[in-house]
Amino acid sequence: MIRAVESAPHVSAPVLAAYGYCEAVTGQQARNFAYGIRLLPAPKRRAMSALYAFSRRVDDIGDGTLDGDVKTARLEDTRALLDRVRAGEVDEDDTDPVAVALTHAARVFPIPLGGLDELIDGVLMDVRGETYETWDDLRTYCRCVAGAIGRLSLGVFGTEPGARGAERAPEYADTLGLALQLTNILRDVREDAAGGRTYLPADDLAKFGCSAGFDGPRPPEGSDFAGLVHFEVRRARALFAEGYRLLPLLDRRSGACVAAMAGIYRRLLDRIERDPEAVLRGRVSLPGREKAYVAVRGLSGLDARHVSRLAVRRQA
């Protein structure tokens, strides 16, 4: 069992202010994520916002316009800051609110901070312009930038006392992170191409005649772009099916949070599957009312119960 502490006996005003900053960053920069974590009790919601704010800082360095050498130096500076957080060397009156909040969160919850080192490693792969020949290659990258986030989040959520199979929770959290990241990659195909990045495996691109890349609102001439998208959608669905085994291992509100976030991405996947070329015309997204429905469904436990029934059928 992975146990999470529900609350600290006292949270000082400077720490609360630091958390407030992180929650503002989360609300402004990650609406899907923010929709999910609003279902959590305050201590867990604050800790998740601290994780997001630190992760966002790392991502922003990688996505910025600085030279590669400067990005690398800044990422290593961020890793040094993480070392200070890990050692508990960030005081609550430090001028960096993200470091203050993350240090407090790591004291309250058993967060495996090494996952943030993995995230930095993954962004360094972006900075170096690495491409991926096979799914196994891409999977390694996805584990760094998304699977690690799943395992970090599990440190905040914890598992339900007595949950059967709880020892596999980190594995399921990792797999669910991969499912979310592959969905992101499909959604952002054109945006990434405009930035000179291609994440889909070269083997898959060649198989469906898409090696020329995606530089406009139409697929490469003569390609089977729909076939490529449907192939990757099936892969993502298999990852979701495995990752959703995490839900019955969590308490009700943590399970609702995960179900809401994952549910939003599953519905994005549905939209992409119905209209593959939509990802070349612009960013596919869900309207607020649909996100609200997903959140209610997650809070009701419908997704967790559905996954539990499927797990029982597989074991039968």
Where are the regions that the model predicts?
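Catalytic cores of Mg2+-dependent Asp-rich isoprenoid enzymes
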Residues: 1-182, 186, 190-316
